[in-house]
Amino acid sequence: MALSKRHLLAAAALLGLGLAAPAGAADMIGNCELSGQKGSIPIANPAKAGQFTVLTSLPAPIWWNGDAVENVKDGMEYCMSAEIAWRAGYDKMEVINTSWEAFIGNQVSGYDVGFAQTSITDERKKVFDFTTSYFNSDMGVLAKADAPVDEKSIKTAKIGIQQGTTGATFAQEVLGIKDPQIFADQSEMFAALRAGQIDAAITDTSITLAEEAATGGTSKVVGQYKTGETYGGIMQKGNPNNETVSKIIQSMIDDGTMAKLGAKYLAAGWGKDPATVPYFNP
């Protein structure tokens, strides 16, 4: 079962109790405290010898805290990757950053798994193998706090979408948005919103909430649409390690590690419960 809003809030409540950690120095990768046993679900032949290699697309605040690879030491997907590396038997993890177009277009090789808040779709399954899903996501609408859009006005508003995303497909095919402005990456789209070049941006609720937090509330998630989407990691088709990566993720879900990471990085970073964002009808 992927991480849901209910799991996030429950784990956040537990963390808020201030439960004491066991004595002794914790195992760490970056700023991530590792909870599993090293090598408990081993991967003998990773993409690069002696390390675990992860592909992503930056920036992605809260999921990867930092705009450049050398600055990222924590975040939801970073620490999730670190835990996977550890349980696979590695204390060295390399992160490769690429554009979203290259990431989702399967233009990069030489990695073990890629995490970039990627929705699992049938079309993408033709290109990649996906890991077990680890997060449930709906589609959010981000607008300027002083000029919000609503369920009706969004149909005629100037909408921004990111190329190659499920948000772009949803806006055009489900909402019937005509002539949206298309951006190559999230940062360009959100910059256009802040500059008033678009009225709203449509992308995953989790991503819009992170941007709301990053702007200090000058941008606001005014609504969301229920989609039933889930996030998964991308893997090169047919790699014999793919099943093992999914097994590690499932072990993290089962033992509560995923929920704790979600509470620490997502719930705390957003500063609000995603369930409080009203749902729009398409």
Placement of each model-derived feature along the sequence:
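Extracytoplasmic small-molecule ligand-binding "clamshell" domains
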Residues: 28, 32-115
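Bilobed "Venus flytrap"/periplasmic-binding protein-like clamshell domains
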Residues: 54, 58-62, 70-87, 118-120, ...
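Periplasmic-binding protein-like
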Residues: 58, 135-142, 205, 209-250, ...
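A structural signal for short loop-to-beta-strand junctions that line the ligand-binding cleft
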Residues: 43-44, 75-77, 125-134, 219-223, ...
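Alpha-to-beta junction loops
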Residues: 90-91, 108-116, 194-207, 217-218
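Acidic, polar ligand-binding/catalytic clefts
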Residues: 93-153
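Short helix-initiation/N-cap motifs at beta->coil->alpha
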Residues: 93-105, 146, 163, 181-191, ...
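Extended ligand-binding regions for polar small-molecule ligands
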Residues: 26-36, 78-87, 158, 165, ...
